[in-house]
Amino acid sequence: VLGANNGFTESHIIIIDITKFGDGGTIEKLLEKANIIINRNLLPYDIKQGRNYLTPGGIRLGSQECTRLGMKEQEMIEIANLIKRLIINNENPLKIRSEVNELKSSFQTINYCFKSNTKAYEYINIQ
């Protein structure tokens, strides 16, 4: 995690140097196959090391969508373990995908904004 030594992890976003396991573009596509959406992200030193925006050395994780759906610390740990199993353990993304879908099935209501009974991803009429 970039900036961890400076206390920069008190945000809903973290940037991770992923170069030990591949490039950010490849990791982004792998996680997407498992229904985990992250973004590839250039690191400050990527250009000097020959990387570009398609194959950067980093990935960016944000927790705002998970939080909006009501997930808390325990679910974040579970998501981190799913990501680890994909990237480090090289598990099948389709197997992980079913676990992601199962986890998300319990979180279908928007929290912390709008009415608490608003269904997630349902079109909201703005008047």
Positions of predicted regions on the chain:
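Conserved small-domain helix->loop->beta segment predominantly found in fold-type I
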Residues: 1-32, 37-57, 112-116, 121-127
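PLP-dependent enzyme catalytic core of the Aspartate aminotransferase-like
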Residues: 50-127
